[in-house]
Amino acid sequence: MTSGRAPHATVLLLVGAVVASACGNGSATPIAIESPRQATAAATPSATPPPTPTPTPKPRFWPLTGLSAPADASLTRRPLNVRLPNDPNARPQYGLNKADLVFDLIVEGGVTRFAAIFHSKDADVVGPVRSYRFSDLHITEMLRGGLVSSGSTVQEHDAVTASINAGKMLSVDADRDARPYYRLASRPAPNNLFTGTPADREAVNRAGGGGPVDVPALSFLLPGADPSSGGLAGAVPATKIGVPFLGVWASSFSWDGTAKGYRRSQNGAQTVDGDGSGPILAKNVIVMTTDIFQTAVIEDNLGSKGLDYRMTGGGAASVFRDGLRIDGTWKRDGALDMFKFFDPSGTEILLEPGQSWIHFIYPTWNVTSTP
C-alpha cells in the first residue's frame, strides 16, 4: 500500500574505510544512508477579523410634523401651500387631515381662510381652492414652497411674481397653470374649485421647482419623550380653547384625552375632513399676536381692503399641547426662518409630533381657555 507521506531523499555516501568482504574482492561497497528528516513547522492559523458592525440608521423626522420619516422619504421635496376658504358654505373642506400645518388667517372683513401646508403626505382631493393674500407670500417664502390657489388681485400677483423671479418660492395658481384644477358640479361657485397635491407637484415640476429645497423645521419633542419636558414653565391645564375670530369664523378646540390631541369646532360643529377620514386632531394649537394692518388693495366687490401681517421679529404667544397652556413668546429672525416659541423662563417650547394649527390675532385680542 502506498504511504500518504512524501518520500524522503536518500544520499549515497562512500565510506573511506575498506571493509573486508567475505568475497575478499577488496572493493568498497557503497552504503545508502538516509538523511535526517527535516522538521516541518506547524502552520499558524490566521486571526479571524471581527465582524464589521452594521451602522444604525440615523433617525429621520419630517420637519413640519416631527414624525418619523421612512428611509426613502424625500425630506427636501417642496411643501405646498393650498389656500382654502373657511366660510360656512365652503365646509367641509377636503384634505385637512393630510396637512402638516394649517394656518388660520384673517383676511378682509373679518373673514378667515386656511393656508394648508402639505409636505409629508399627499391628498388626492383638496379643496375648495380660493385666492391667496399677502400673508401667503410670507408663509410660502418661509417654506421655500409652491403656492396653490385660484388666483389673486393684480397687486398680490405682482408681489408673488417678484418673489418667484428672486428664487424665493414658486406659484402654480390657476392663473399660471390651470391643469391641476377642476370644478365639482355638486357645489356652487366659487367654492367648487378642487385640486390634488399629486397634480400640483406635477405642475411644480413643470415650473422648474422639482429639485430639493431646505425646508425649515419646527422644534418638536422626540417621539415617545415625556410630555412634561420641553419648555413648560408656567404651564396650566387647558382642555378648552377659544380663538377670538369674529362671528361665524370664531373657532374652538377641546382636548381629547384618548386621542391625545385637540378636536376643532366652529359654530358648534366639529371640524371634519370632507374626504370621510374623520374629525381634525391637532397635536398643537398656537396663537400668536402680531401687527395686522390694512392695505390699499381692494379684495372683493364690496370694496373690502386686504390685510398684511408682520411675521418676523416677535411677540406674545400661547402654545397649547398635551392639555396644557403655556403663555410665552414667539420669535422669527428673518423671512426664511421658522417660528420658534419660548416659555416665560426663556426655554424653547418643543411641540408634540403631529399636526399643528397656527393662528395670528391682533395684540388687543385674547385667546381664552378653561382647565
Residue ranges of predicted features:
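Intrinsic disorder/low-complexity segments enriched in small, polar and charged residues
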Residues: 52-54
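Short, low-complexity, disordered segments immediately C-terminal to signal peptides
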Residues: 24-48
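Bacterial N-terminal signal peptides that target proteins for export
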Residues: 1-11
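C-terminal motif of bacterial Sec signal peptides marking the signal peptidase cleavage site
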Residues: 19-22
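A surface/extracellular/periplasmic glyco- and lipid-processing/surface-interacting theme
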Residues: 31-34, 45-46, 56-101, 108-371
